[in-house]
């Protein structure tokens, strides 16, 4: 299965280095000069390969690799004027560099959303090591929407499993539980 390419950050194997004590780093766009930079003053969480059609992916990748960090720990530190929201109607407001197209962070503005307060980040845009490694794959079937032939999906899922990234066609069970718990709380069924 090694011939199925997922994403450059995981194709050679998921690196499970030491994350203890890691307190964050700086994300940079891919422009040659006047780079947009975003400081993330926190370890990332829920890092995963995402097959949705909205997330930024490097050239040729079937999946993005995306994690979350607390919103109050994510700060644009250089060239905010180059950022533009990709789709203002989307739940996740993805802030992309107008120069190179890279998504620097995604933010949820709906205070009632279960993930409000968490910003989505691409740790591969950081030169610092120590970020949490990817732990699962989400929205796997969605890569069909971006051009992967359906008859390749068994091979893609096998490769994800081989890499230790359990494939889901939604989010991981813990994140789906968080979404459902939020809905139940808003309905008054849980406190």
Swiss-Prot record:
Zn(2+) 1 binds at residues 29, 31, 97, 100. The lineage of its organism: Bacteria, Pseudomonadati, Pseudomonadota, Gammaproteobacteria, Lysobacterales. Residues 22-169 form the CENP-V/GFA domain. Gene3D superfamilies: glutathione-dependent formaldehyde- activating enzyme (gfa) (3.90.1590.10). The gene is gfa. Its EC number is 4.4.1.22. It holds the Pfam family GFA. GO terms for biological process: formaldehyde catabolic process. This is Glutathione-dependent formaldehyde-activating enzyme. Zn(2+) 2 binds at residues 50, 52, 55. It is an enzyme of class 4 (lyase). Pathway: One-carbon metabolism; formaldehyde degradation; formate from formaldehyde (glutathione route): step 1/3. Binds 2 Zn(2+) ions per subunit.
